[in-house]
């Protein structure tokens, strides 16, 4: 049974569609990638799940179920409680995600104390254990540090520890290595996968990088213009992508085993055809 079930989810900004009848499932313990170029709607799906969509965006239809509960049918306070107990986010930029004027310790323990009702002592002990688990040396010192006193990679490790603090059943990782240099990216990807396997957490990995998908994901969903174009197992996708856009996206991805590869951008014809298809679908449903 899927832990996360999204069915026919649609959203708009005014008259402009942002998500178009999106359906996808993530099973317990599964690692699924959400793939697409900028503006495809990847992050909007994550925000819709977590209830953090910008105020101007309105959900116009569909369901989002976490462990069988339809989040969109819950009152705001109940929805926050359910999400706080079952899901967490690893954000893109650790520097902006962390509060610059608060020490690291309270930023990890706040969720445990405020949402789950843990004692401060138990929450601090849990935070120390998690910082050690994500391979941060001297966790006690880091608990007392401010974000600016840590490197980018250390800050991202803090956010990973924070995401796993309440033992969520679903982690949404929103391009979590974008703000890091290449050598640190590899370490963080390995750490996320290690933590996901150890805690048997479902992972929805938002990315535009198919190389990352190949390293850590089992399945993927390809988006364009807020619409799902293809779903596949990762091995099957890389062997034989089915949708023309998926094939073009794969052809535009550098292969480190072929330094002489000629990269082919996604043909404008495919983009034009997709945009025309989306405009036609919009006219027939309004």
Regions found by a protein language model. Give the residues of each.
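A short, surface-exposed alpha-helical micro-motif characterized by mixed small hydrophobic
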Residues: 213-215
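Short catalytic/signature loops enriched in Gly
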Residues: 137-141, 231-286
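A short, proline-enriched helix->beta-strand linker immediately N-terminal to the Walker B motif
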Residues: 165-169
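Conserved ABC ATPase "signature" region
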Residues: 70, 122-141, 250-251
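Conserved ABC transporter NBD signature motif
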Residues: 58-70
């Amino acid at each position: 049974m899927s832990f996360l079930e999204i069915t026919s989810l649609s959203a708009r900004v005014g008259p402009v569609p942002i998500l178009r009848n999106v359906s996808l499932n993530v099973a317990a313990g599964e690692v699924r990638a959400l793939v697409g170029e900028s503006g495809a709607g990847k992050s909007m799906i994550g925000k819709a799940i977590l209830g953090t969509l910008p105020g101007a965006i309105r959900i116009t239809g569909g369901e989002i179920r976490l462990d069988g509960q339809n989040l969109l049918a819950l009152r705001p306070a109940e929805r926050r409680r359910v999400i706080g107990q079952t899901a967490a986010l690893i954000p893109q930029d650790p520097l902006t995600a962390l509060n610059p004027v608060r020490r690291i310790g309270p930023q990890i323990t706040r969720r445990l104390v405020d949402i789950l009702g843990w004692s401060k002592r138990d929450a601090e002990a849990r935070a120390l254990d998690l910082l050690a688990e994500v391979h941060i040396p001297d966790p006690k010192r880091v608990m007392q540090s401010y974000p600016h006193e840590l490197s980018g990679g250390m800050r991202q490790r803090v956010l990973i520890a924070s995401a796993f603090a309440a033992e969520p059943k679903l982690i949404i990782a929103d391009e979590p290595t974008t703000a890091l240099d290449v050598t640190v990216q590899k370490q963080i990807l390995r750490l996320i996968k290690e933590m996901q396997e150890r805690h048997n957490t479902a992972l929805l990995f938002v990315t535009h990088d198919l190389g990352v998908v190949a390293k850590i994901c089992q399945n993927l969903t390809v988006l364009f213009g807020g619409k799902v174009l293809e779903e596949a197992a990762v091995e099957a996708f890389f062997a034989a992508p089915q949708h023309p856009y998926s094939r073009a996206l794969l052809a535009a991805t550098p292969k480190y085993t072929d330094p002489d590869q000629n990269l082919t951008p996604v043909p404008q014809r495919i983009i034009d055809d997709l945009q025309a298809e989306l405009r036609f679908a919009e006219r027939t449903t309004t």
